Amino acid sequence: MLKDIFFEQVKPAYGCTEPIAIALSTAVGKKYSKGNVKSINITLDKNTYKNGLVVNIPGTNTFGLELAAALGYLCGDGNKGLEVLKDINEDCLKKAMKMKNMVNISLNEEQHLFVNTTIIAENTVQIVIEGKHDNIAKIVVNDKVIKNEEFHPGMTSIEKIKNYSLDKIIKYVEHPDEDVLKYVEKAIDMNLKIAEYGINTKGNFSNAAINEYVKYVSAGVDARMSGVLMPVMTVAGSGNQGLACILPIAIFKGKVEREKLLKATLLSILVTIYIKAYTGLLTPICGAGSISSAGAAAGLTYLKGGNNTQIKNAINDTLGTLFGLTCDGAKRGCALKAITGTFTALQVSSLALNNIDVPCGNGIVAKDVEETIRRVEKLTNSVKNFDKDVLDYIGKC
């Protein structure tokens, strides 16, 4: 059911979800670890590594995968999922700055999200997070297997949304479950708060924004990437995607009923999840700048009275315009990519409502938006080497 997929893919998180996944692995491992820690050895996929290199950890004003691991072990709560670092404090940070030297990071060739953490103390604890930032797939204490759920990329909850078409998703949005709409309201409130915090922060990218839409989106993304200790409602595993697909709808100033605005936000969220099911959760393509913008374009078009054809044209044209905007790691600069996507969503929605769209055959744009999405999937998979090569430059001036 779309309701189940929605609740599985829309969750609050403190901080960028890649270092948070690392912190979650050590926080869970701490429950089983005995005695003083000798070392923490972590193996990651390239995308998780890429997104954790230079993004600030919430509440710390600094960054580092090793630090995230130490914070998770020392003061993380493994029962809080993506909110694992919600309660960190200055004392914990001081201890973690010393402990991070015990953490060793290495890479593997996995193409999906993969965090394999081994904590060596008086005993040895292995924690594997796989497929999703909060999916604890494996727990092994010494040689005793506590949990072992075999991961298959095609069996994740996000894959199930492929059983629906965009028309079916739009139909559901017209008559959604009541608890889903209530949760959308919560998502709007949560993401507005961090955006408003960013707007009132000197030096935030939103300070020079030229309209309200990009001001709110850039403010939220910049605040989150800067390590502000505030929750963000994530969409398909990403807080930036959550901000970029929710805020352009949330701040709409036109005269519309609140329920209509909530439904439009829901459509934006579901379209984002739908496209991410094809591209993958962690990819070489910028989710906040391109995929979420397609969701926002759909939501804005629906909000302004657009029909199914116009909504799908808005999605089609956004993907045709923004595909190729790459992900070179999580950082403050993501705010500028989100700005680019928001501008495009606004423009494309206006064009769609006037029945103006990119002709099929122009670049990757197909006549049927579902075919365009499949082309985006194929092309995303064709640039996998980007993730390896870009690591040569991240963090280096």
Curated annotation (Swiss-Prot):
Leader peptide range in chain numbering: none
Pfam family, one: SDH_alpha
Any GO MF annotation of the entry: L-cysteine desulfhydrase activity
One of the GO biological process terms: L-cysteine catabolic process to pyruvate
Source superkingdom: Bacteria
Paired cysteines (S-S): none
PANTHER family xref list: UPF0597 PROTEIN YHAM
Family: Belongs to the UPF0597 family.
Protein name: UPF0597 protein Tmel_1007
Organism name: Thermosipho melanesiensis (strain DSM 12029 / CIP 104789 / BI429)
